[in-house]
UniProtKB/Swiss-Prot annotation:
Superkingdom of source: Bacteria
GO biological process, one term: biosynthetic process
Boundaries of every HTH gntR-type domain copy: 14-82
Name of this protein: HTH-type transcriptional regulatory protein GabR
Gene: gabR
InterPro entries xref list: Aminotransferase_I/II_large, HTH_trans_reg/aminotransferase, PyrdxlP-dep_Trfase, PyrdxlP-dep_Trfase_major, Tscrpt_reg_HTH_GntR, WH-like_DNA-bd_sf, WH_DNA-bd_sf
Organism the protein comes from: Bacillus subtilis (strain 168)
Function as written in the Swiss-Prot or TrEMBL entry: Activates the transcription of the gabTD operon. Is also a repressor of its own expression, both in the presence and absence of GABA. Binds specifically to the DNA region overlapping the -35 region of the gabT promoter and the -10 and +1 regions of the gabR promoter. Principally regulates the utilization of gamma-aminobutyrate.
Keywords: Activator, Aminotransferase, DNA-binding, Pyridoxal phosphate, Repressor, Transcription, Transcription regulation, Transferase
Pfam families named in the record: Aminotran_1_2, GntR
Residues recorded as bearing N6-(pyridoxal phosphate)lysine in the entry: K312
Residues annotated to bind DNA: 42-61
Cofactor or coenzyme needed: pyridoxal 5'-phosphate
Family: In the C-terminal section; belongs to the class-I pyridoxal-phosphate-dependent aminotransferase family.
Length: 479
């Protein structure tokens, strides 16, 4: 049988055996090589192509392994009988335009994003040292499947940490580690009653809202008052599960006082199977005031599901979060029996070493002071540039705050101009859970300062001024 194979012998080309393999596969699929026909012997094809027998043998062995050829002892290799494809071969696959990702190079942009941490000040060398120690100490653990809830010693380290820093009352057995809060929330929806009605803060965390909706859950929204979730609205709407961010309401920045926390706990205790999901968002960083302990620390009825993450205190890319389940839900979890751990064992063990070595608390202390100074410089620059035409809210905690501006421009106008000025920033409407809710009052923007470089503060504020007013301020009233 004559087979014509043209080989590319340039340095950039695929290996010779791969080219032979690809050509023969194509000939078989196109029926140019018919089923049960004999292909040339390895030596014959090698001589024809002026290549080594090993190259031809590697190609034949791959085709044999994939089922394109079969071998008969002392007779050689033959083409396997394959069904014809039911469709014609198309040109190289092209993704529809609406599914393509558009990459925008923002390396030269100034970022007021609320979704980041300050990577420039992350102690990467300390983290790598801890990783090396963890790998050396527990390398056998890396060869095993991790416990579904996470490695016990890691859960114990996190339990001690949140008991000390947040007042959370729990045992390691109650904790589940996962690769992000959304992963844990998805799991939680499967543990809570199927018919449970959820309620979230409005405005709030839209991704979590969409996760619940996509899971087929009924989700109500609760407007905020000056203390957080409105008790009157909760009483009126009668949900079964509240999702709240009491330490630093996302995105408004409100810190829920103890009086409202007690009201929420009493509400949960009024009826069986009511729960509060406490997303302890941004709890590590408070300024000018001491941290208020977690809502879970006040819980006397085991109705609070506590959720925490290391995305803000360390790095979002580590993807390590955790939740603490009340005994009733922990029992439901253990009865499932089919869950797998989603977080890397090495990341878990490195975190354990980072916490137990004291590096974590050292890092938090350093970053708290760093973020406080950066925040103060940013607010001072905003107030100076906008001459009293800006209101700052929710700046006592977390890595972002809310700003409202006296301007005729709408939020969308401001965001459009900001993008043109290479300024990354987001508006409050992004966090409206109800899509038909329209902007009322002054436009409000979320100002994140974690990623913002200190040397870019003044320039960033000046760009923001141009986005809000243009080159010349446009007053709200008057001509």
């Amino acid at each position: 049988m004559d087979i014509t194979i043209t080989l590319d012998r340039s340095e950039q080309a695929d290996y010779i055996y791969q080219q032979i393999y690809q050509k023969l596969k194509k000939e078989i699929l196109s029926r140019n090589l018919l089923p049960h026909s004999k292909v040339p012997s390895k030596r014959e094809l090698a001589e024809n192509l002026k290549v080594s027998v090993n190259s031809v043998n590697s190609a034949y062995q791959q085709l044999l392994a994939e089922g394109y050829l079969y071998a008969i002892e002392r007779k050689g290799f033959f083409v396997e009988e394959l069904d014809m494809f039911s469709a014609e071969e198309h040109p190289p696959f092209a993704l529809p335009d609406d599914l393509k990702e558009i990459h925008i190079d923002q390396s030269d942009w100034i970022s007021f994003s609320h979704m980041s941490s300050d990577t420039d000040h992350f102690p990467i060398k300390s983290w790598f040292r801890c990783e090396q120690k963890a790998a050396s100490r527990s390398y056998r653990t890396l060869g095993d499947m991790s416990h579904p809830q996470g490695i016990y010693e890691v859960r114990a380290a996190i339990t001690r940490l949140i008991s000390l820093t947040r007042g959370v009352k729990c045992r390691p057995e109650q904790m589940i580690i996962g690769a992000g809060t959304q992963v844990l929330m998805q799991l939680l929806t499967e543990l809570l009653p199927k018919e449970a009605v959820y309620a979230m803060e409005e405005p709030g965390y839209r991704r979590m809202y969409q996760l619940l909706k996509n899971a087929g859950k009924q989700v109500k929204t609760i407007m905020l008052d000056e203390k957080g979730m409105s008790i009157a609205e909760i009483t009126r709407q009668q949900p079964d599960v509240l999702v709240t961010t009491p330490s630093h309401q996302f995105p408004s920045g409100t810190i829920m006082p103890v009086s409202r926390r007690i009201q929420l706990l009493n509400w949960a205790a009024e009826e069986p199977r009511r729960y509060i999901i406490e997303d302890d968002y941004d709890s590590e960083f408070t300024y000018d005031v001491d941290s208020i302990p977690a809502l879970q620390s006040l819980d006397r009825f085991q109705n609070v599901i506590y959720m925490g993450t290391f995305s803000k205190s360390l790095l979002p890319g580590l993807r390590i979060s955790y939740m603490v389940l009340p005994p009733e839900l922990l029992r439901a979890y253990k009865q499932r029996g089919y869950d797998l751990q989603t977080c890397s064992s090495l990341t878990q063990l490195t975190l354990q070493e980072f916490i137990e070595s004291g590096e974590y608390q050292k890092h938090i202390k350093k970053m708290k002071q760093h973020y406080k100074e950066k925040r103060e410089r940013l607010i001072t620059a905003l107030e100076a540039e906008f001459s009293g035409e800006v209101t700052v809210k929710g700046a006592n905690a977390g890595l972002h705050f809310v700003t409202e501006f006296d301007t005729r421009r709408t939020e969308q106008d401001i965001l459009s101009h900001a993008a043109g000025l290479q300024l990354e920033i987001f508006g409050m409407s992004r966090f409206n859970l109800k899509e038909n809710k329209r902007q009322t009052g002054r436009p409000a923007l979320i100002i994140g300062f974690a990623r913002l470089k200190e040397e870019d503060i003044q320039e960033g504020v000046q760009r923001l001024f141009k986005a809000v007013y243009g080159h010349k301020k446009i007053p709200v009233t008057g001509d």
